[in-house]
Amino acid sequence: MRKLALSDEILMKVDKPARYIGNEFNSVMKDTSQVNIRFAMCFPDVYEIGMSHLGIQILYDMFNRMDDVWCERVYSPWPDLHEIMKQENIPLFGLESQEPIKDFDFVAMTLQYEMCYTNILQILDLAQIPLRSRDREDGCPIVIAGGPCTYNPEPIADFFDIFYIGEGETQYGNLFELYKKAKADGLSREEFLHEAAKIEGLYVPALYEVEYNEDGTICCMKPKYDDIPVKIKKQVQVDLTNSTYPEAPVVPFIKATQDRMVLEIQRGCIRGCRFCQAGMIYRPNREKKVDHLKDVAAALIKNTGHDEISLSSLSSSDYKELDELITFLLDICKEKKINISLPSLRIDAFSLDIMQKVQDVKKSSLTFAPEAGTQRLRNVINKGLTVDDIMNGSKQAFEGGWNKVKFYFMLGLPTETEEDMRGIPELANDVAALYYDTVPKEKRAGKCQITISTSFFVPKPFTPFQWARMYEPSEYLGRAKIVNDHVKEQLNRKSIRYNWHEAYVTVIEGILARGDRRLCDAIVKVYEKGGYYDAWTEYFDYDRWIDSIKECGLDPDFYTMRERPLDEIFPWDFIDIGVTKQFMIREWETAHKETVTPNCRMRCSACGAKSYGGGVCYEN
């Protein structure tokens, strides 16, 4: 019988001790004498958020189907336990075995958000693994990173031995085979990493050198050896239908942030929103066959006991077999009183019939993302959404019995003017007025409630807006104030609620998103000063970040306030995502002409993703 890593005394001291004990329903236990590879799958945030992440569930299931691999889960300890583990010298452990992960073969992290970078160091520190790759000796685990943040791995390059660029289903088997052979042949850590760098999609940062110009921009980046690639090619699982998927995912003991079954219906997006990194890095769009999804949904319901199923996709409305899938789900879910969640709906593709069936009893609020307050700016960002689309979709919703609508917008987008900012509350006011004009008083479900939320735009790598500048926190807050003041001037202001994102976090996120390798030292400084859980408002300290960056001889404005010239070499230019830089430049220029590029089903825009040989590129 396994022994818990934490004593009862410690568990009674900390918040939500169930975060740390493992043994949840559908978790996997194995005999360590029967496996060759022990793999720690880490999420650098709290348990409840990490347990909501589909990517970890997919890889956990895939690895544990391999007879000689045991994959365990690790989440960032909450600050209360962090302090105890440091004081009592308790090494970070895997949930399943409760054994220290410093003794595992691999420690991997999925990186979803730049503000979790200090938690990378927290995990390594608590695990008693050297923070920097160069300080790890032959007995240390191989430390790997994957996920969307690895599309610019440079600000965290010092902390990882390997970055896995792309979708995890494709190359881990080859990496494991290489590792077993390297162990059998007695290869050193350095020799193994050299061989790993030859596997397509794997980037070993220690084997690449970066040279800088006098102005701080990158001059060049080159491999140290001739037998490793100059460009790292993103990995894509072209056939999603026949790839691995967890039909019996781990069910947490405590409520997770997304406490539901997740059914991935497609990957990628046919839309080309110019601010959206996910829409670019997950190209080409690939759909799963509906009959397969029906089988998976039935298995999830049987194996989990959750009372809600969510369809995972960047744009659910664009899944071609959505009607058939929803009809099937309604049939099997109604009897079991299971709710169906449809995130990522486009207001122009809004299906009242589907939504009325899904929410035929309880009319929860509907959420849409126009992103910009005027048609001009929506054209700039390639949202492909008109005022008529928004008003017609809202009218259908009101006629269907809804009275609560949430709209998401961004402030600080390229070319934004005060007119665009003022357009946000004006649009909300028009939608509220439409409710009172459309729904007779006796049929109203209550007062109309329009919630508008604004985040501040952060330029991300591999988007057409990767050249854009950012602003000081005071400028962002000034833009939010313009929106807030104009809300108060609207005729239907009592029906409008406005909230906005934290401006100071936005600036640091922007620095990390487009940063270079020189920022590694700054991240270490932030952690050494007590910074971690920076994604959480109560633990974030803007001055600590800015001071640490400056102490490393770097100028924060260099990373945020500049609009980049088109010929600048980016820290991430050594990665090949299929979508070409020429396409990005064309889209950047098209944005400034306020011109819309059609979606992938309407017309191929020759972005380059067709090179992967599948998906929407080959539908016609």
PLM feature spans:
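Radical SAM enzyme core and accessory elements
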Residues: M1-M29, S33, F39-M41, E489-N620
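N-terminal [4Fe-4S]-dependent radical SAM core
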Residues: I10-A40, Y47-E48, P205, E211-Y212, ...
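N-terminal pre-triad scaffold of radical SAM enzymes
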Residues: F39-D45, F63, P249-Q277, I301, ...
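Conserved SAM/AdoMet-binding glycine-rich loop
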Residues: M41-C42, V46, M115, D295-T451, ...
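Canonical Radical SAM [4Fe-4S] cluster-binding loop centered on the CxxxCxxC motif
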Residues: H53, K255-D291, R603-N620
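Short secondary-structure boundary/capping segments
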Residues: I56, E88, L124, D158-F163, ...
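A short beta-strand-loop structural module common to alpha/beta enzyme folds
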Residues: D67-D80
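Glycine-rich beta-alpha loop elements in corrinoid/cobalamin-binding modules
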Residues: P77-P223, P464-D516, I523-E538
